[in-house]
């Protein structure tokens, strides 16, 4: 008989983890939960994970965030505290605001305004470039893994990237790119996964960027063409087919010309390629300029339609 899966760690409001007071649960994942906590300096997020969990996700999170903090990174949470308490490991980090997925779904059309989606897309790609620069891939890029900052910290224009549970180091200790494995399992979320993932190939930096492009389309239009498909192979096929009919993906109000150029660039890169982020930023800024709307305010700032979601 196999042992039952370990129970997720459950903390109650008012309980203490070292100096942190638990306020409420914010969410739950496969390996643990996230809580709102406070100390004398303010509000933070506390992530917990049982020490018997086979996948030690928090370990990767701490590794990545510590490395990024050394570089003074713009789009990442800061670790305030970490340790072991009773039967679980915990990390206390920056408390962020709503996810881009929640904000997108807060609109009747399920999409952000064009200027807002392009500006957030630029920040989302900056975050990936920073991550890649320290030798890590994210491998689960999606709107649910990006958030905005909190109004009380004056961070409504700041985009954070979260969740490094699927991250992988693609360089060795000397900064040399590791040889790709002959076969790699499926990683990530089917809707946004890159074609290489459907083929069970090793993922590289270009694959994070491909995934970012699908996310960009969804933020701008409200959907990707394969939204209704559930079969993993059909979704993979749809992504390949869209290369022949890109207009079916880059529908109004997408800046089709620029996004097509970006997709062509991504498709020309191989596993070892160092993505040309600068050229993508240039095309995104060009699209922003051409859309004829100001970059700011974002859709959730005071006086804007989504402001009700961040109060």
Please place each PLM-identified region on the residue numbering.
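Activation segment signature within eukaryotic-like protein kinase domains
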Residues: 120-121
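Catalytic-loop of the protein kinase fold
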Residues: 132-153
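Activation segment/activation loop of eukaryotic-type protein kinase catalytic domains
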Residues: 147-187
